[in-house]
């Protein structure tokens, strides 16, 4: 139910843009940046003083408040809270966000600044209880559509956000069962719209639909098919050796 609700919220987002003739952003949408004003260029928030963070706004434009530096950081989007240098060697330390993250934040803030008048109502929806951080990020990889419709696409819930692609494409099959592709146009026997890709469909993607036996759990099956090579691809290579 939560997954379907989150998909519906993002469909509403697309509807709002279409109704107002606003193109869908080509960059990943990070809704948590809508209304945020914390400094992100130069030193990352982790290295800023409390004084630098005071009076600014963090997640979804909420005021940065608290009794400690940790409290202040907790008010920021989760990807802005940590030490960006913890995976770097001493000589590579920059104390700042990588360029790609700075670019995404800049793009999202400008997008919201330009269109906040049409997104105010929707902002309440995306902040509903039960929305995971990654579900508040969204990537539309389907190009221009006059009336964009998530329910005719392939959806994948990833750690980096909800990714939507044309139905002619299937995301990589991985072990993590939360990232199994969703086929939203199929109606289940219970009358619900949308379901996850089945083990048999995953086998067919790898041209293994003639298999008599498939691993008996979703996790095992997708791990096996994700680590496999497409049978037809191997056959064509072998035919040309």
Q: Across the structure, where does each feature detected by a protein language model lie?
A:
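C-terminal target-recognition/interaction regions appended to catalytic cores
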Residues: 36-241
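Flexible, glycine-/basic-rich loop-and-beta segments that form/coincide
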Residues: 1-58, 63
């Amino acid at each position: 139910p939560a997954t379907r609700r989150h998909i519906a919220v993002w469909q509403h987002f697309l509807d709002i843009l279409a109704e107002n003739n606003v193109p869908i952003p080509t960059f990943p949408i990070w809704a948590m940046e809508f209304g945020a004003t914390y400094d992100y260029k130069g030193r990352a928030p982790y290295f800023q003083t409390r004084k630098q963070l005071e009076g600014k706004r963090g997640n979804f434009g909420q005021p940065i408040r608290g009794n400690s530096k940790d409290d202040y950081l907790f008010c920021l989007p989760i990807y802005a809270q940590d030490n960006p240098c913890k995976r770097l060697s001493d000589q590579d330390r920059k104390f700042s966000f990588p360029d790609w993250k700075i670019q995404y934040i800049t793009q999202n803030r400008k997008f919201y600044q330009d269109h906040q008048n049409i997104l105010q109502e929707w902002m309440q929806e995306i902040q509903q209880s039960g929305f995971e951080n990654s579900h508040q990020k969204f990537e539309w990889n389907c190009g221009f559509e006059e009336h964009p419709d998530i329910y005719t696409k392939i959806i994948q819930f990833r750690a980096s956000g909800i990714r939507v692609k044309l139905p002619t494409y299937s995301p990589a099959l991985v072990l993590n069962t939360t990232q199994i592709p969703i086929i939203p146009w199929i109606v289940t026997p219970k009358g619900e719209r949308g379901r996850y890709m089945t083990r048999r469909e995953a086998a067919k993607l790898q041209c293994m639909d003639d298999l008599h036996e498939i691993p008996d759990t979703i996790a095992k099956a997708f791990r096996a098919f994700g680590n496999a090579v497409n049978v037809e691809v191997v056959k064509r290579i072998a035919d040309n050796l």
